[in-house]
Amino acid sequence: KEIHGNRGKGCPVFVKEWPDPLAETKAITEELRDYHLMGIAYEDMAVLYRTNQGPRLLIERMMEYNIPFHMRDTVPNLYEHWISRNVFCYIYAALGDLSRSNILQIINRPARYISRDALDTKVIRWEQLRSFYQDKNWMLDRIDQLVYDLEMLREMAPAGAVNYIRKAIGYDDYLREYANERRLKPEDLFEVLDALQESAVPFKTYEAWFNHMDEYKEQLKEQSALREAEKEGVSLMTMHSCKGLEFKVVYILDTNEGITPHHKAVLEPDLEEERRMFYVAMTRAKDRLHIFYVKERYHKRQTVSRFVVETGLLGKKGDLEKNGKQGRK
């Protein structure tokens, strides 16, 4: 489908590639603020994304910059996912929470074959646990390794701790086995850990990271309460929810293969519906349209969406934008 504006010649469409989502969301936030300083109301701006999983980083960045926003859709809280809670339980244990309820969340994730019967006190004491397995040297080795791992975690920065839990302790292996037993895709579970690790990067201490999570949770609660109230600030919404609305400035977030079109859309009718949603998203912009995609996500190379290529806005291969530089207009 060829797309033509009906308001005469206006501003060019800006298509940009960013190194990663952190750079992408930082740029969007700064540009929204700049548009506001130019006299455009926040209510006349929108950021659109394919699914409600998309805006977490952007929400966190907008909170940091104190840019008002409202969400049309409910956004799941990454920090309340059961996988995230498992990671937090490791950190809580490293910081001294040896309550039975906390230790039960981690003791066999990954499998250490430690019986619940061995954890029969409200607060777990490692010496008592060793006594329970005193005639099984291989179990004593596992207990000692866990104690060592918790001591290591205590001194780490949050992002390093998440990586240590995944790779050194073996939580990724646990998730892989969990997924295989249930015929799930391990990659879908790893995405939660990737997002969690990405979230931890800006913070040097657990306290700062946990404080940020509390603020994020409160913001989601506030957005939920205000969803039916008067809409103030930048609109954040899925492509599906934006139909019928128009804004002076529109950003389309994460226009990469696997996101738009969604990786689950494989049949031609599904792909056509994805294409239609992308078209709807583009046509929400009255004055300025920005289409953003990333080069790398979670240390994996990404490809620009076929829908962006189909628009012809990328031009020749040599015209592709790199690292946030402006490409063809």
Regions found by a protein language model. Give the residues of each.
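Conserved short internal alpha-helix adjacent to the catalytic or cofactor-binding core
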Residues: 11, 64-67, 75-110
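Accessory C-terminal helicase-associated subdomains
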Residues: 134-241, 259-262, 288, 321-329
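A short beta-strand element within the Helicase C-terminal
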Residues: 85-89, 234-262
